[in-house]
Every structure is written in C-alpha cells, then in structure tokens.
C-alpha cells in the first residue's frame, strides 16, 4: 500500500475537532480493546490531532509530526512506529525466519510461513478473517509489518495453502520513512 508515497500525495491537513477525536478514541478501543489502558496516554484531551487526507482515499492521523495510525475505507490501522511503543495492545502473529526478507520487500505472507516450526498463530478461538494483525518474526524483538488476515487463523492452520496475510505496511516502506516535517 505504501510502496510509493510522498508529500506530494498529501491533499489536505487539518486539525480534528475534539468531538471527532473522542469518536476516534472509541473506535480505536472498539477495534483494539487492549488499547483502552493507554488511550488517554496516547491521545490526551488537549492533544492536537491532525487528519491528513492523501491520494487513494488514505487518511493519516498524526500528533505533532508523528503519524499514529491511518485509515483506508473503514478500519483504523496502526503504524509500525506506534506499534513499537505499545506492542502488547494489538493482535500478533509470528512468521518463520525464511519469510522475513519477503515481508520486508512488501510481499503478502503465505500460509506455510505462518504454520512452520518457527511461526506462531494465536490459540483458539483465534482471529477472524479481515482482522488487522501485527507481524513479528522468529527471534526478532520488534514487529516488522502490519497486515490484514485474508482468512481466519483456524483456516490458515487447516488449509495451509495460499496467501494468509495481506501486508499493508512494513519496515522500510514509504510510510515508515515518511516525515511530516
């Protein structure tokens, strides 16, 4: 999604009203329940949250010069910089070592890379299809990508073929290297 992204893709940049900020907070907590503990630390009442409208109907939400999350269609998706600050707040999957170089180049994640010995998926009941997940790698401390499940984790385990996760944002892509300043 962010293979080609620059300041030229920005159309408008406006301050968000406090009522909109409250609804965004509740939407974030609804989508990621574990964020409830840190949501007031993340977006304090007097924080100036900005919405940055970009091409391809992408909206970035930033505090100061840091993009915290973005929106394409309905769902809010955290940036990796935000995930690195609050890693325990998001659903996580783990890939094996062999898939790292492919994910870092923006490739979607295949099911065998999620079911091999170095990989890990959440225990039952698992995650539903279309869930936003943080992608960690075997023996690595920080997340390397944000993705969207193309099938449930139970289906990934049972089918074990095809694409399992669509990579939306990864280390080294244009959003990772993007600066608002």
From Swiss-Prot:
Coiled coil: none
SMART domains on file: PUA
One Pfam family in the UniProt entry: Pre-PUA
GO cellular component annotations of the record: cytosol
Keyword annotations: Cytoplasm, Protein biosynthesis, RNA-binding
Alphabetical GO biological process terms: formation of translation preinitiation complex; nuclear-transcribed mRNA catabolic process, nonsense-mediated decay; ribosome biogenesis
GO MF terms, alphabetically ordered: RNA binding
Domain of life the protein comes from: Eukaryota
Domain spans labelled PUA: 90-172
Subunit record text: Associates with ribosomal complexes.
Database matches in NCBIfam families: unchar_dom_2
Full protein name: Translation machinery-associated protein 20
Species per Swiss-Prot/TrEMBL record: Eremothecium gossypii (strain ATCC 10895 / CBS 109.51 / FGSC 9923 / NRRL Y-1056) (Yeast)
Name of the gene: TMA20
């Amino acid at each position: 999604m962010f293979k080609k992204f620059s300041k030229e893709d920005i159309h408008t940049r406006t301050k968000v009203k406090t009522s909109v900020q409250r609804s965004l907070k509740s939407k974030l907590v609804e989508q990621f329940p574990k964020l409830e503990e840190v949501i007031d630390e993340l977006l304090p009442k007097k924080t100036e949250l900005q919405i940055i409208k970009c091409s391809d109907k992408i909206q970035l939400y930033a505090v100061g010069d840091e993009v915290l999350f973005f929106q394409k269609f309905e769902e809010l998706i955290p940036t990796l910089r935000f995930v690195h600050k609050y890693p325990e707040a998001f659903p996580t999957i783990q890939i094996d070592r062999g898939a790292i170089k492919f994910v870092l180049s923006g490739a979607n994640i295949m099911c065998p890379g999620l079911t091999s010995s170095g990989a890990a998926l959440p225990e039952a009941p698992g995650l539903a299809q279309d869930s936003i997940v943080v992608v960690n790698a075997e023996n690595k401390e920080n997340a390397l990508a944000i993705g969207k499940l193309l099938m449930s984790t139970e289906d990934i385990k049972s089918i074990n073929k095809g694409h399992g996760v669509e990579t939306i944002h990864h280390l080294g892509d244009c959003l990772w290297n993007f600066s608002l300043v």
